[in-house]
């Protein structure tokens, strides 16, 4: 059975409550050889009381006359406190996009008072998150861009870091345990911030290995990486403590291995001596048995 959707994109809208624009767009993403984007009306489209949200062809003018895209998609307003409360307003809707219909969606995605309600879960740290899942079922007209040559990368915003979806869960858990982790981080460039976070995840992955899988060079590299991240402003006392524990375990493991090898060699020598001693005992037993044997009449005569 094929995948229900080809791609899943998360759009994070920052400072949603203070947006002044009537219309905002997501970055472009590529599905089925076509550039798409999401467009949102934070104050509502012909409905001032609801968030309006649409999926659209990003650059329709780049497509030839007569182009069409038969598409199935789903829009979800994410509840950041509870997956069960996330609102899926469009469920597997199928729509033909063409020159006359370049956008399709809902003028009333969700009431604004529900979004802004205290502890509703839709706004967290001023951020609103929207997910679109999309599958292109049929294409008429040449492709304007191929999936293979696209440089667009799907990312998810986690506490101001643009990360791969595969990294998001681990980083969210890390911030939940250590909320001050990046409060003093100096680099503001998104690429640098992402690079530092990837380095931090790699370091944690290294420390998660079994002691026998790590070399002394790995530990030296880990200390260098830790120093670099602390210089950048990360608060990593908890990780430094863990690195020390891992280093200590590595030293204990190496010392134990050395001691174990010596004990095994000693045990081997002792076993050999036992075998030799057992042979001597058997030999002496034979002598004793011979000495104790009675002398027969034939032996005397």
Swiss-Prot record:
Residues 235-289 form a coiled coil. The keyword Coiled coil applies. It comes from the Eukaryota. Disruption phenotype: Susceptible to systemic infection by tobacco etch virus (TEV) and to some isolates of lettuce mosaic virus (LMV) and plum pox virus (PPV). Changing residue 284 to K: In rtm3-1; susceptible to systemic infection by viruses. Residues 6-134 form the MATH domain. One of its GO terms (biological process) is defense response to virus. Keywords: Coiled coil, Plant defense. Self-interacts. Interacts with RTM1. Required for the restriction of long-distance movement of the pathogenic tobacco etch virus (TEV) without causing a hypersensitive response or inducing systemic acquired resistance. This is Protein RESTRICTED TEV MOVEMENT 3. It comes from Arabidopsis thaliana (Mouse-ear cress). The gene is RTM3.
């Amino acid at each position: 059975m094929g995948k229900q959707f080809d791609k899943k994109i998360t759009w994070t809208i920052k400072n949603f409550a203070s947006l002044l624009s009537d219309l905002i767009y997501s970055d472009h993403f590529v599905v089925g050889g076509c550039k798409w984007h999401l467009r949102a009306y934070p104050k509502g489209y012909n409905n001032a009381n609801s968030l309006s949200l649409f999926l659209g062809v990003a650059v329709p003018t780049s497509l030839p006359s007569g182009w069409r895209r038969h598409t199935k998609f789903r829009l979800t307003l994410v509840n950041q406190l509870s997956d069960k409360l996330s609102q899926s307003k469009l469920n597997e809707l199928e729509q033909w996009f063409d020159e006359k219909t370049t956008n399709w969606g809902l003028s009333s995605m969700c009431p604004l008072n529900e979004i802004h309600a205290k502890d509703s879960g839709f706004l967290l740290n001023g951020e609103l998150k929207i997910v679109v899942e999309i599958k292109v079922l049929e294409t008429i007209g040449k492709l304007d861009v191929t999936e293979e040559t696209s440089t667009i990368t799907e990312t998810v915003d986690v506490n101001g870091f643009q990360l791969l979806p595969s990294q998001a869960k681990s980083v969210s858990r890390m911030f939940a345990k250590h909320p001050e982790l990046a409060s003093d981080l100096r680099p503001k460039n998104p690429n640098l911030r992402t690079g530092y976070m990837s380095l931090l995840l790699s370091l944690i992955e290294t420390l998660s290995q079994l002691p026998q899988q790590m070399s002394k060079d790995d530990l030296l590299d880990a200390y260098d990486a830790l120093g670099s991240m602390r210089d950048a402003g990360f608060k990593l006392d908890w990780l430094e403590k863990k690195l020390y524990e891992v280093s200590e375990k590595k030293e204990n493991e190496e010392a134990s291995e050395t001691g174990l090898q010596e004990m095994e060699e000693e045990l081997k020598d002792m076993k050999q001596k036992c075998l030799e001693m057992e042979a001597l005992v058997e030999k002496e037993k034979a002598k004793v048995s011979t000495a104790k044997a009675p002398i027969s009449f034939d032996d005397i005569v």
